[in-house]
């Protein structure tokens, strides 16, 4: 089974390194510097020291990716619509399975990644690939656990077999909505946890905040489904609790580090400056706005997410933010 990966950031490249050890992989990038770097050094600047197999061919033209039987989308969520439209314009075949490896909620529409794909490529089957997985550890082929969510059991089982590696424990789920909600929210909570840690409020407050975060995940998850039901296996599995713990406790997390810099700044922080200092997208920044608006649309209270939103977008003080986070 040929596999294309769209997005040559740290995460997309890590997946390419993992799968490329045994499969032919096409890795698409829009960045000519990245293209030349990988082709010249067989290494990405985002993952120094991690060799990219010769089985991975790098392409600049998206039309060179459409003949694979599986397409993995590892682009930022706010760029997903544009990439899907490009695939549509290239006449992507209807039987090509699309695996979403991006996390977030589109700001302009409040749609999940699967809803964006369904809108533009309605005939292509969709799966979600999510869980606790730092790109650098995946690229180094350290052990990790993920969830492959798909509403088609036959396709899901086939994709699990294709993505399974010796160092990966891959669990199957039908819960594509729950898995995506958890994946998006954890980045906002990681920013909140970073603020608490950066403000030196201690691990007790940090642990309490993670615990309260689970309640907000459950609230949005339940409201988004509409019937109040949630899958406890999703909440307590790798895609939710596992990813939340990892993202909210390690400074390898871009979102936690972002929040830490804010909390450690004594109110003298500049959000745009901190964002510009990083080499990668801080998904939680965009997601905070999306979650704030989605919670309003669904008429639910999410005080942690609201506090992070008001700090990032409405210049709320760190003191006012912390009073909510530790209340």
From Swiss-Prot:
Location of the active site: 186
Catalytic activity entry: sn-glycerol 3-phosphate + NAD(+) = dihydroxyacetone phosphate + NADH + H(+); sn-glycerol 3-phosphate + NADP(+) = dihydroxyacetone phosphate + NADPH + H(+)
InterPro entries, A to Z: 6-PGluconate_DH-like_C_sf (IPR008927), 6PGD_dom2 (IPR013328), G3P_DH_NAD-dep (IPR006168), G3P_DH_NAD-dep_C (IPR006109), G3P_DH_NAD-dep_N (IPR011128), NAD(P)-bd_dom_sf (IPR036291)
Binding site for sn-glycerol 3-phosphate: 103, 131, 133, 186, 243, 253-255
GO cellular component: cytosol
UniProt superkingdom: Bacteria
Residues that hold NADPH according to the record: 11, 30, 103, 135, 254, 281, 283
Protein's cellular compartments: Cytoplasm
Any one Gene Ontology BP term: glycerophospholipid metabolic process
EC number, UniProt record: 1.1.1.94
GO MF entry, a single one: glycerol-3-phosphate dehydrogenase [NAD(P)+] activity
Pathway given in the UniProt record: Membrane lipid metabolism; glycerophospholipid metabolism
Family indicated by similarity: Belongs to the NAD-dependent glycerol-3-phosphate dehydrogenase family.
HAMAP family: NAD_Glyc3P_dehydrog
Identification of the protein by name: Glycerol-3-phosphate dehydrogenase [NAD(P)+]
Source organism (scientific name): Wolbachia sp. subsp. Drosophila simulans (strain wRi)
Lineage: Bacteria, Pseudomonadati, Pseudomonadota, Alphaproteobacteria, Rickettsiales
Gene name of the encoded protein: gpsA
């Amino acid at each position: 089974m040929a596999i294309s990966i769209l997005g040559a950031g740290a995460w997309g490249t890590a997946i390419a390194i993992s799968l490329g050890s045994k499969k032919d992989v096409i890795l698409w990038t829009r960045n000519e510097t990245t293209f030349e770097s990988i082709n010249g050094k067989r290494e990405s600047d985002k993952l120094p020291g991690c060799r990219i197999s010769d089985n991975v061919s790098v392409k600049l033209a998206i039309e060179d990716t459409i003949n694979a039987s599986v397409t993995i989308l590892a682009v930022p969520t706010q760029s997903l619509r544009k990439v899907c439209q490009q695939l549509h314009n290239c006449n992507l075949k209807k039987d090509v399975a699309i695996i979403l490896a991006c996390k977030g909620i589109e700001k302009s529409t409040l749609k999940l990644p699967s809803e964006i794909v369904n809108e533009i490529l309605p005939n292509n089957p969709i799966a979600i690939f999510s869980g606790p997985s730092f790109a650098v550890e995946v690229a180094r082929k350290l052990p990790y656990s993920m969830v492959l969510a798909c509403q088609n059991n036959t396709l899901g089982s086939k994709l699990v077999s294709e993505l399974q590696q010796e160092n990966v424990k891959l669990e199957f789920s039908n819960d594509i909505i729950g898995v995506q909600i958890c994946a998006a929210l954890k980045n906002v909570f990681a920013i909140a946890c970073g603020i608490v840690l950066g403000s030196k409020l201690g691990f007790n407050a940090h642990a309490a905040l993670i615990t309260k975060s689970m309640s907000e995940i459950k609230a949005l998850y339940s409201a988004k489904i509409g019937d109040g039901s949630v899958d406890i296996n999703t909440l307590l599995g790798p895609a939710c609790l596992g990813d939340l713990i990892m993202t909210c406790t390690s400074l390898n997390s871009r979102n936690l580090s972002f929040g830490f810099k804010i909390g450690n700044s004594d109110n003298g922080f500049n959000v745009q400056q901190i964002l510009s200092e990083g080499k990668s997208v801080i998904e939680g920044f965009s997601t905070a706005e999306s979650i704030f608006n989605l919670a309003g649309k669904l008429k639910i209270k999410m005080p942690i997410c609201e506090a992070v939103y008001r700090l990032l977008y409405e210049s709320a003080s760190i003191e006012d933010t912390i009073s909510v986070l530790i209340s």
